[in-house]
């Protein structure tokens, strides 16, 4: 014989729920007395307080071993990478000479990028250094004492400086300037007391043919030793990264040209199997003319 369980009415369910939340007979709140709730809250307070204290202590101990100015560990690759300016999506520099809007965005980006390189700003913040040697500065033991940096003046970029330039870095005439920027690597030395230089080529034979002639600023794409070593963002507050400007004079119009630029120095390996692209940057250049 099957005994059917009596179905509770809605009122009974509500009454049972109210009694669970607060039972006036046993003085229990949600099935526990005040003492029971106090012990539970005390347990979790002590438990999570202990975890917080342990986490804080371990973080404090770890931070005592880390310098706020120089990283304790550095990347396995000591070779600096390269980037280009203007910064574009997918590293594609596309210029429609007759369409001002196509290259005006590049000009605006370059104006902002080169503003810290103005000669007047450099004269206020940085030193005039003797070329051809590293600008090494001893550690005087005062961590908050900033290192000095050498001037890199905008006028060193010649026809690509954009100073009084009616051609807007050459973009309005189909002779655009592209700037090569080397990433900062703390305590990097080029080696052999010889300046580094940047070279650019077409990636394939047809690219080399379509690339045409170009000129570099500073001359021969040289990067002087005075901008090294780099001591870090907090030590080298006013450090200015050296640039190499490449002005492309007669790129074959309406053709996509693959360009590769690399940095050359005695202490930079260009055949490192761990990262074959570390000392170079590849980008596409297209000059559209109607």
Curated annotation (Swiss-Prot):
Subcellular location: Cell membrane
Transmembrane portions of the chain: 40-67
Pfam families recorded: Na_K-ATPase
Stored InterPro entries: Na/K_ATPase_sub_beta (IPR000402), Na/K_ATPase_sub_beta_sf (IPR038702)
immunoglobulin-like, as annotated region: 193-289
Cytoplasmic side: 1-39
Topology relative to the membrane: Single-pass type II membrane protein
Position of the signal peptide: none
GO biological process, one term: intracellular sodium ion homeostasis
Topology Extracellular: residue spans: 68-290
Glycosylation site positions: 96, 118, 153, 193, 197, 238
S-S bridge residues: 129-150, 160-177, 200-261
GO CC list: sodium:potassium-exchanging ATPase complex
Recorded GO MF terms: ATPase activator activity
Alphabetized UniProt keyword annotations: Cell adhesion, Cell membrane, Disulfide bond, Glycoprotein, Ion transport, Membrane, Potassium, Potassium transport, Signal-anchor, Sodium, Sodium transport, Sodium/potassium transport, Transmembrane, Transmembrane helix, Transport
Domain notes: The C-terminal lobe folds into an immunoglobulin-like domain and mediates cell adhesion properties.
Function of the molecule: This is the non-catalytic component of the active enzyme, which catalyzes the hydrolysis of ATP coupled with the exchange of Na(+) and K(+) ions across the plasma membrane. The exact function of the beta-2 subunit is not known.
Subunit structure: The sodium/potassium-transporting ATPase is composed of a catalytic alpha subunit, an auxiliary non-catalytic beta subunit and an additional regulatory subunit. Interacts with BSG.
PANTHER family the UniProt entry points to: SODIUM/POTASSIUM-DEPENDENT ATPASE BETA SUBUNIT, SODIUM_POTASSIUM-TRANSPORTING ATPASE SUBUNIT BETA-2
Family to which this protein belongs: Belongs to the X(+)/potassium ATPases subunit beta family.
Stated name of the protein: Sodium/potassium-transporting ATPase subunit beta-2
Organism of this sequence: Bos taurus
